[in-house]
């Protein structure tokens, strides 16, 4: 574009020209024919520039002059006031100042009126431009938008010559620009009025932009010509872009604000500098009479500035004018510094922008859950493996993970593999904004994972409790399932007003369940493995070889499920339904949800014949997958009575009561598949029998109302608090004490160790469904300083002793007769602050290997076996019932530590490889596939991870598991413990004694007794039916010798667990049968009833035959006196301990 165009057909009458142009030597410029311009084509750029300079410097001069006069006036006035005060002091205060000064009162009134008027106007202007009000925000945003509009007009006009003749009434862009600048002028006035410091306001960037852009527009209208000039300065308004976005509440985070700030400063500087180069290069140098100009578009200048800032400098575009080159020299210094600092920081902010920001978009017809807390590769993979297991049918639930740390590459890859059902968002549940992002208000549940390996369990629990508080505060109705490490921290959850276990909120206490599982293994070895496998989803692994792994893995494939019973079972007793379901449907039902006359739900585990199946009864089944359990719901006596193949039992065409009442069954029926849980009214509150089932008359008659033997709930044995000094045994005292059939608990802990929570280990062993003489003595071996810290929770339990020492000392172990114990428990030291994971269990592994390598003199066991105190519970040596017929004949004692029953707690699963030296387990083998775990001699807290998903799909499963392993702990009892941190004793009443009438887990020997005929090649299904019909015992598994399948005899005494064997499974004489046995009211008077015997009877191959005896009514009256005399001797001995 050229500034030299020939002018033709112009009006030469100077009087008709709109402007009287002074005569001066100037370059003739071309103009359009349509616009009446100066006939001589004189440049008028100086007029536009002068308008801005005069405005700027004139205003600056006025402000400085006003400040100077104000300063002089203030100084003079101040001097006059001083003289006046001096005169008042000298003249007594009656004289007046000179006549030039007004009276004081009148002057003060005028100043106050003046200040009040100015202040009100100033405040009004401040409100108008303030972003704190709606009007101010609208005005600020409008000014910014119009500034960008003016900049766009500049971009459009930059394609025209720098100076051209344009008619204001015909040029549309000039009219729009004029309107914009009128608005800018008004806004400038408001800003000027509201400014506290007028001088700084006059010098700030936005004011300078207005000075050099607004006045030239009015000059353009007057001269009928346009000059691009300094209109590019409007680009500096982009610096305020971040402020505008903050006013609109779009930018909220510091990183986003910083990013927008850097980008806006960089772009505005870039565009402004490009505008200056465009101006000088297209105009030329004034001292060269504008002859050295070059034609550059604005965007070519933008390109030139970019290659200059980046130090590339291709040379294809460069500055020719002196002004342009001089500007480039200084711009390179500043531009290069800005480019080198701003661009990397911008890239870093963009690169660090949260990849997992955004918000969750709910899918119609699909529920979602939020998982938070301890999110790592291990915890997430374990959770997903169980939650998305194929045996759960189609899980139509999306999993949303929320964590404040972005996932590493391995975890990110895991999320990508499950991208159809898993999403990850970076954030914190403590932030309500992040909770809104994951749509917590519409989530079906929120699951909180805990770090099981943290160094400070109390701190981890506190973090999870705060997460619960935050989530419940945001949405009180959300269902929360959280993991807790310490039992005593569960009490804090009860303080949250919206926490309601009846609505589905659950706290899975890992210490409570872990120690409960171990405690049950003291009563029925191997039970911890069986229960852990039942609530964990495992795929079936088929092995053709006839090895112990084949039978173990067949049982591992079983899980716990719930399903509603068909109306065909209504009216039948629980044992009758159990037998029918097992024999015909190939299912094992162990419990039901029972509604009392008050419509209160309770879960009954193996109730007796008195419980009849109601309509809509929920059954708890052990099966290999959810499809098999549906047979219990589809079963129809008319259609399926003659079917022998259970796979053919499917929904029939009969009109069923369930179909007539869909509102009763349908809402709950699908809880397995989609997580639909029971309604609040159906949440079971207790796992005990009907309250009407009170003890028999004999038990009530023998009840001593003045003695507190049980806690206030009647669920546990209780005794008055004992001082710890009274239960401490020295090594010599322990050696002199007759200890047999007891439980030795080895503890590695010191005064600084985190508390294990030994109460959770002792409570199941002190459940009230055991008679007092059946309770196993518990001996703790460990640091006295640590045990003192735990004693406050243990001092109300009977038959507890402490031997200060170390489990690594063989002398301490011999002192407690470890070779005669029923179980040796080795608990982890909780040393989770060790970097090497393999060393976390070093004490437990060393203690286990130390015990297994010990040798014992058989004569000691024989001598002690001849003493009365060695008599195992459930056997009377003076009774004729003590015969091989009942399987309680005492065998020679253990001579090697390898035969001592041990269960070892491990922190790190991989350390299980060090426990058994004769196994061939690979270090990468999963825990449940290893020999120590299959045999029930090792337990790790990691197996409890599966309870999170199991509880979500069915909260009754957690209630069932908790009752089985804790001995009967209920929410009411937890509230009581939270109040006092100790069990409270209570008097025996028919109501509390009724709570003793509940099932317990035991083991049944097949070597002799009523089932001896089935032990040698018999059928497991026949044993199941016989035990159920005769003794109301519900069998659910086998504890078999590891080498029982071999044709040649083996000296190995290790056993493994077989869960829910099929009906035709062949039995061997050495098998021990897991069973749920009823509470025997008469066992308190006669110890020849079916009771749990000392498990030292199976700890060696010679003693594997006797665990339980079968009730015998013969000679019962004759044995009562003998038992009473022996009980007196034992009570005296217990007091001494």
UniProtKB/Swiss-Prot annotation:
Known regulation of its activity is: Ethanol and carbon monoxide-bound heme increase channel activation. Heme inhibits channel activation.
What residue intervals hold the motif Selectivity for potassium?
311-314
One Pfam family of this chain: BK_channel_a
Q: Chief subcellular site? A: membrane
Q: Where is the composition biased (Basic and acidic residues)?
A: 1121-1137
Can you cite an annotated GO cellular component? postsynaptic membrane
Q: How does it assemble?
A: Homotetramer; which constitutes the calcium-activated potassium channel.
Which family does this protein fall into? Answer: Belongs to the potassium channel family. Calcium-activated (TC 1.A.1.3) subfamily. KCa1.1/KCNMA1 sub-subfamily.
Name of protein: Calcium-activated potassium channel subunit alpha-1
Gene that encodes it? KCNMA1
């Amino acid at each position: 574009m050229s500034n030299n165009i020939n002018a033709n057909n112009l009006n030469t009458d100077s009087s008709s020209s709109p402007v009287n142009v002074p005569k001066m030597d100037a370059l003739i410029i071309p103009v359009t024919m349509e616009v009446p311009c100066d006939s001589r084509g004189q440049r008028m750029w100086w007029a536009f520039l002068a308008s801005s300079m005069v405005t700027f410097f004139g205003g600056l001069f006025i402000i400085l002059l006003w400040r100077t006069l104000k300063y002089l006036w203030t100084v003079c006035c101040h001097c006059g006031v001083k003289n006046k005060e001096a005169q008042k002091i000298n003249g007594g205060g009656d004289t007046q100042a000179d006549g030039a000064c007004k009276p004081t009162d009148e002057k003060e009134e005028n100043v106050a009126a003046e200040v009040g008027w100015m202040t009100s106007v100033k405040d009004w202007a401040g409100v108008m431009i303030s972003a704190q009000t709606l009007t101010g925000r609208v005005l600020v945003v409008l000014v910014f938008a119009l500034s960008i509009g003016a900049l766009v007009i500049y971009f459009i006009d930059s394609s025209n010559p720098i100076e051209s003749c344009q008619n204001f009434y015909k040029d549309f862009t000039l009219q729009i620009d004029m309107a914009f600048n009128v608005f800018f002028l008004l806004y400038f006035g408001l800003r000027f009025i509201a400014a506290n410091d007028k001088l700084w306001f006059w010098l700030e960037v936005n004011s300078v932009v207005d000075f050099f852009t607004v006045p030239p527009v009015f000059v353009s209208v007057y001269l009928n010509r346009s000059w691009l000039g300094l209109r590019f300065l409007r680009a500096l308004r982009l610096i305020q872009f971040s402020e505008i976005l903050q006013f609109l509440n779009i930018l909220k985070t510091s990183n986003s604000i910083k990013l927008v700030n850097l980008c806006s400063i960089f772009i505005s500087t870039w565009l402004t500098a490009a505008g200056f180069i465009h101006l000088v290069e297209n105009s030329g140098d004034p001292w060269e009479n504008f002859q050295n100009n070059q034609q550059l578009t604005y965007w070519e200048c933008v390109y030139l500035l970019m290659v200059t800032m980046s130090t590339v400098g291709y040379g294809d575009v460069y500055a020719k004018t002196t002004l342009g080159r001089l500007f480039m020299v200084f711009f390179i210094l500043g531009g290069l510094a800005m480019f080198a600092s701003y661009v990397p920081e911008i890239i870093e902010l963009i690169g660090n922008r949260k990849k997992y920001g955004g918000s969750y978009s709910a899918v119609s017809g699909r529920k979602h859950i939020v998982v938070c807390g301890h999110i790592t590769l291990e915890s997430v993979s374990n959770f997903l493996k169980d939650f998305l297991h194929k045996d759960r049918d189609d899980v139509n639930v999306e999993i949303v993970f929320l964590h404040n740390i972005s996932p590493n590459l391995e975890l990110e890859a895991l999320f990508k593999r499950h991208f159809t059902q898993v999403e990850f968002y970076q954030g914190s549940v403590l932030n309500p904004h992040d909770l809104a992002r994951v749509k917590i208000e519409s989530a079906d549940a929120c699951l909180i994972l805990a770090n099981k390996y943290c160094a400070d369990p109390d701190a981890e629990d506190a973090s999870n409790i705060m997460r619960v508080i935050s989530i419940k505060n945001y949405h009180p109705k959300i269902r929360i399932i959280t993991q807790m490490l310490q039992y005593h921290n569960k009490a804090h959850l009860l303080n949250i007003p919206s926490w309601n276990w009846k609505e589905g909120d659950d706290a899975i206490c890992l210490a409570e369940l872990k120690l409960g599982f171990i405690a049950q293994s003291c009563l029925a070895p191997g039970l911890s493995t069986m229960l852990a496998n039942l609530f964990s989803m495992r795929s079936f692994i088929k092995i053709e070889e006839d090895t112990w792994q084949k039978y173990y893995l067949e049982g591992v494939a079983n899980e716990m499920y719930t399903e509603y019973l068909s109306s065909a079972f209504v009216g039948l007793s629980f044992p009758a339904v159990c037998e029918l379901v097992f024999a015909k449907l190939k299912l094992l039902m162990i419990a039901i949800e029972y509604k009392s006359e008050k419509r209160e739900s309770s879960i009954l585990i193996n109730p007796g014949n008195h419980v009849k199946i109601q309509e809509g009864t929920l059954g708890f089944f052990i099966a290999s997958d959810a499809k098999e359990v549906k047979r219990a719901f589809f079963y129809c006596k008319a259609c399926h009575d003659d079917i022998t193949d259970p796979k053919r039992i499917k929904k029939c065409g009969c009109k069923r009561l369930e179909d007539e009442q869909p509102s009763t069954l349908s809402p709950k029926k699908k809880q397995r598949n989609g997580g639909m849980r029971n309604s609040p009214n159906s949440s079971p509150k207790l796992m005990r029998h009907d309250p009407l089932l009170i003890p028999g008359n004999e038990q009530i008659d023998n009840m001593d109302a003045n003695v507190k033997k049980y806690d206030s709930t009647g669920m546990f044995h209780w005794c008055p608090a004992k001082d710890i000094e009274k239960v401490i045994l020295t090594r010599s005292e322990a050696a002199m004490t007759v200890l047999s059939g007891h439980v030795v608990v080895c503890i590695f802990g010191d005064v600084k160790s985190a508390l294990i929570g030994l109460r959770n280990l002792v409570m199941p062993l002190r459940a009230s469904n055991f008679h007092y003489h059946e309770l196993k003595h518990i001996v703790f071996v460990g640091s006295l300083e640590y045990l003192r810290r735990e004693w406050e929770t243990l001092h109300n339990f009977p038959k507890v002793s402490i031997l200060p020492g170390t489990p690594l000392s063989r002398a301490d172990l011999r002192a407690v007769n470890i070779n005669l114990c029923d179980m040796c428990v080795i608990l982890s030291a909780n040393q989770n602050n060790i970097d090497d994971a393999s060393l976390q269990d070093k004490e437990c592994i060393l203690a286990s290997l130390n015990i297994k390598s010990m040798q014992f003199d058989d004569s000691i066991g024989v001598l002690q076996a001849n003493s009365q105190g060695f008599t195992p519970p459930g056997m009377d040596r003076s009774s004729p019932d003590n015969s091989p017929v009942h399987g309680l004949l005492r065998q020679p004692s253990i001579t090697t530590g390898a035969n001592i029953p041990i269960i070892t707690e491990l922190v790190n699963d991989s350390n299980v490889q060090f426990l058994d030296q004769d196994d061939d387990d690979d270090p990468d083998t999963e825990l449940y596939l290893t020999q120590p775990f299959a045999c029930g001699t090792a337990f790790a807290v990691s197996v409890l991870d599966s309870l999170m998903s199991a509880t979500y799909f069915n909260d009754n499963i957690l209630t069932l598991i908790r009752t089985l392993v804790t001995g009967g702990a209920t929410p009411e009892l937890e509230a009581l413990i939270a109040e006092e941190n100790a069990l409270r004793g209570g008097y025996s009443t028919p109501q509390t004694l009724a709570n003793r009438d509940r099932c317990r887990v035991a083991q049944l020997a097949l070597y002799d007794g009523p089932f001896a005929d089935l032990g040698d090649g018999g059928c497991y299904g026949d044993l199941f039916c016989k035990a159920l019909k005769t003794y109301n015992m519900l069998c659910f598994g086998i504890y078999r010798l590891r080498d029982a399948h071999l044709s040649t005899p083996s000296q190995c005494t290790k056993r493994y667990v077989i869960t829910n064997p099929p009906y035709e499974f062949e039995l061997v004489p050495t098998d021990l049968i897991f069973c749920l046995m009823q509470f025997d009211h008469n066992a308190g008077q006669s110890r020849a009833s079916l009771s749990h015997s000392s498990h030292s009877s199976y700890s060696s191959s010679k003693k594997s035959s006797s665990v339980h005896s079968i009730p015998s009514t013969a000679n019962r009256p004759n044995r009562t006196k003998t038992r009473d005399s022996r009980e007196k001797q034992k009570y005296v001995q217990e007091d001494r301990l």
